[in-house]
């Protein structure tokens, strides 16, 4: 992950694998997270999915747009990629990441602040496999969209600058819709 996507010291820690699900932010951030959750931000799912969807494939389409026109870094909001990625993976779905140009997916550094970070984001920070997928995303134009059961669009400010203007994405979404694929986003 590029340096601009991991600007905080805690992003460089690599706890043992058995601690990933228990990784916790500092106490003030935990308190603020609880307050944010009580206000409806990143609520826990009262009825989590428990099925297995082995053999299915999902594509998460992310942005390459890394900078706002005012010179500030932007990209996708981390939880809008990490939450569906881990939920799909835990259900047994094979997940690929794609972007309009392929290669580096821009991640908004503000989405890693302790208060707004989810436990899925905490997991991403120590997950070398997903971090490698973020660095080497697939180019949408090169994909066989028919090979995927789900096409999901991850949001964030960067997505507003390139996802809606990509001819390749428009073509692939049209093909996915015609084939009856599940298409969603946030």
Go through the PLM ranges and name each one.
Residues 2-179:
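Extended, subdomain-level signal for the structured scaffold at the beginning of enzyme domains
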Residues 183-186:
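Short, glycine-/small-residue-rich phosphate/pyrophosphate-handling segment
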């Amino acid at each position: 992950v590029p340096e601009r996507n991991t600007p905080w010291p805690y992003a460089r820690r690599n706890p043992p694998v058995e601690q990933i699900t228990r990784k916790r932010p500092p106490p003030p951030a935990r308190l603020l997270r609880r307050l944010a959750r009580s206000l409806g931000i990143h609520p826990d799912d009262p009825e989590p999915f428990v099925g297995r969807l082995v053999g299915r494939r999902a594509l998460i389409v992310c942005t390459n747009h890394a900078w706002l026109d005012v010179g500030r870094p932007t990209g996708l909001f981390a939880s809008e990629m990490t939450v569906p990625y881990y939920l799909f993976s835990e259900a047994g779905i094979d997940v690929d990441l794609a972007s309009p140009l392929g290669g580096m997916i821009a991640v908004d550094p503000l989405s890693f602040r302790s208060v707004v970070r989810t436990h899925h984001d905490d997991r991403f920070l120590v997950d070398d496999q997903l971090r490698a997928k973020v660095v080497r995303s697939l180019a949408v134009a090169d994909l066989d969209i028919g090979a995927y059961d789900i096409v999901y669009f991850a949001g964030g400010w960067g997505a507003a600058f390139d996802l809606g203007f990509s001819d390749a994405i428009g073509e692939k979404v049209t093909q996915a819709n015609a084939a009856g694929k599940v298409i969603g986003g946030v």
